[in-house]
């Protein structure tokens, strides 16, 4: 698999975003699709950052890797769900960024068309497999599963990049043989007639010999902003924790927010909201840190990242301090 590369600072100009943030303001970026959309919409609509005394500026990106590019360029201060793979790579490369939270769990299934002759994961050898673009945690985890659990070489399968709706369309059109799709996407496509042949959770458990699911997205924070606003990182994390708890407690409210902000139908919004507890997390406990370190080693084994992950790449202090905020 192609290595997750260091991201160019020139992205700041290309993205056309504003300059350095003022004290107690925070520029927050997230992908306007996939499972990032749901949490971002609830975070905004509930004004959770404002309730912690912060002034947020939300920046939505059309590409899964764009928030990390913006972070590397200094264009945003916090990404609510940066790709775990890219985040591990850039922090190992020494960029002045810190992982302060695990925020998304890789709750994906490997699926094929209902009438496909493919029955098992081993049958994917020589096939076209749809996944998120190179550089995403989804792509890195897919490669790790195929190459470690099934002894595939990179030449034994063809990865086809795309976002979930596009990959689902490719499957229906028989342009690809299989795809790794988020469970929330599958829930929103009841008429697509897809059949599950494997899951990220089970395959990761086989790979790592541990029960913890793979982490798909992380809260990534800019070190300079953290230094300039020493009490603000804990407030950001507190807001994230409260938004997560809100979603756990009030699924109908989440569905209403998704209908309004994402133009989902009532049925689709309800199906999305029902998956809240299984696709999101807001934590950086010792077990999460251990899981991310293990993930780095798995990615390194398949060439997705290089080097050594420094202990400073994972900063649990904002999470710990957030627990003191009522």
Protein language model features and the residues they cover:
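Sec/Tat signal peptide C-region and signal peptidase I cleavage site
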Residues: 17-23
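Short, glycine-/small- and polar/acidic-enriched structural segments
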Residues: 24-161, 173, 177-183, 188, ...
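Conserved C-terminal helix/tail region of periplasmic/extracytoplasmic solute-binding proteins
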Residues: 296-326
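Bacterial N-terminal signal peptides that target proteins for export
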Residues: 1-8
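Pocket-lining segment of extracytoplasmic ligand-binding domains
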Residues: 85, 166-169, 173-258
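Bacterial N-terminal signal peptides
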Residues: 8-16
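Secondary-structure end/capping motifs
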Residues: 226-304
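Short, solvent-exposed loop/beta-turn-alpha elements that line the ligand-binding surface or hinge
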Residues: 47, 51, 201-212, 278-287
């Amino acid at each position: 698999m192609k290595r997750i590369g260091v991201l160019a600072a020139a992205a700041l100009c290309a993205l056309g975003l504003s300059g350095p943030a003022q004290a107690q303001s925070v520029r927050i970026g997230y992908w306007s699709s996939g499972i990032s959309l749901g949490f971002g919409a609830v975070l905004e609509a509930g004004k959770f950052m404002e309730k912690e005394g912060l002034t947020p500026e939300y920046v939505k990106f059309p590409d899964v890797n764009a928030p990390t590019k913006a972070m590397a360029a200094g264009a945003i201060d916090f990404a609510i769900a940066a790709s775990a793979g890219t985040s591990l790579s850039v922090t190992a490369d020494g960029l002045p960024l810190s992982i302060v939270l695990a925020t998304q769990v890789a709750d994906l299934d490997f699926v094929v068309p209902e009438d496909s002759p493919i029955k098992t994961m081993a049958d994917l050898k020589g096939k076209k497999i749809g996944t998120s673009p190179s550089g995403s945690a989804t792509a890195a985890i897919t490669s790790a599963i195929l190459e470690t659990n099934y002894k595939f070489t990179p030449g034994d399968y063809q990865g086809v990049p795309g976002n979930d709706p596009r990959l689902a369309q490719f499957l229906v059109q028989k342009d690809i043989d299989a795809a790794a799709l988020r469970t929330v996407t599958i829930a929103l496509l009841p008429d697509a007639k897809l059949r599950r042949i494997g899951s990220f959770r089970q395959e990761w458990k086989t790979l790592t010999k541990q029960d913890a699911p793979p982490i798909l997205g992380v809260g990534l924070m800019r070190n300079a902003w953290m230094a300039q606003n020493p009490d603000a990182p804990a407030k950001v994390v507190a807001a994230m924790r409260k938004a997560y708890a809100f979603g756990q407690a009030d699924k109908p409210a989440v569905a209403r927010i998704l209908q309004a902000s994402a133009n989902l139908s009532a049925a689709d919004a309800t199906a999305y909201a029902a998956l809240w507890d299984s696709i999101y997390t807001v934590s950086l406990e010792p077990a999460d840190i251990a899981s991310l370190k293990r993930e780095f080693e798995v990615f390194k084994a398949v060439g997705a990242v290089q080097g050594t992950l420094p202990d400073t790449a994972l900063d649990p202090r904002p999470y710990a301090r957030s627990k003191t905020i009522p």
